[in-house]
Amino acid sequence: MKIVILDHPRENPGEIDWSRFDEYGEVVRYSDRVEDVASRIGDADVVFLNKSKVTKADLEKCPNLKFISVIATGYNTVDVDGARELGIPVANVPSYGTEAIGQHAIALLLEITNHIAYHDAEVRRGRKNNDTDWCFWDYSPIELENKTMGIIGLGRIGQITSRVAQAFGMKVLAYDSFQNPALVNENCRYTDLDTLLANSDVIALHCPLFPETENLINKA
C-alpha cells in the first residue's frame, strides 16, 4: 500500500510519529504545496491532507485512491460529492481543537472588550511610567457580566464558548437547527436567528460551512 501525506508540516508540527505508518507500506511526505495535487497523489491508495484542495478532476486522475483523510475539522478543501461519486470515502477529525477554538473565541472577545494588546504596547513604550498620575485610559473596558452572547451553532465548539461565557456572567442566546434541551438553563436558551441578532451584544459563529450557512451574516 502507498500512503501520501500532503501538507506535512501543517499536519505535524513535531509531536506525531509518522513512522508507525511504515508498517502498512510505502509512505511519501510532501512539505510544499503545488497546484497539481493529482501529480502528488499519483498511484497512492491513501492520502492525508490538511490545506491542499482536491477536486473531482484531481481524483479522476488517481484511479488507485481508496481513502482520503482530512487532518482537520473542516473538509471543504475536498470535493466530497465528487469523491462519493467515485466511491472514495472521506474522513475528518470532528473533535479536533474543540477546547482550543472555544478558548480562542473567548480570547478574541477579551481583546475586543479590554484592548489588551494596545495597552500592553503602550506600557512597554513607557507611557505608564511617564504619566503624571501613573495611569492612562484610552479605552474603557467593557464588563461581560449581564451582557448577552449570541452563539450561532451550539455544537461541540459552541458549547465550550457558551460554558465560558456563562462563567463570566453572560447570558447566552443560541441558534441551532438541532436543539439539545440539556443545554438550556436560566442563562442559556435557544431562539430564532432574528431574535438572536437583535438582542446580542456579541455574536460567535460556530456553525459548519454548508451552502445554507455560507454568507449567513451579511450587511442586511
Labelled PLM ranges:
Residues V54-L59, L173, S177-A220:
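Rossmann-like adenosine-cofactor binding region
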Residues G158-Q159:
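N-terminal Rossmann-fold NAD(P) dinucleotide-binding loop
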Residues S31, I71-A72, I88-E99, D194:
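Short beta->alpha connector loops at strand-helix junctions that form conserved
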Residues N76-I88:
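Rossmann-fold NAD(P)-binding glycine/threonine-rich loop
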Residues L86, P94-T148:
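Phosphate-binding beta-alpha-beta segment of Rossmann-like dinucleotide-binding domains, i.e.
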Residues M1-A44, L173:
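N-terminal glycine-/charge-rich "phosphate-binding" loop or analogous flexible N-terminal tail
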Residues L154-G155:
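Glycine-rich Rossmann-fold phosphate-binding loop(s) that bind the pyrophosphate
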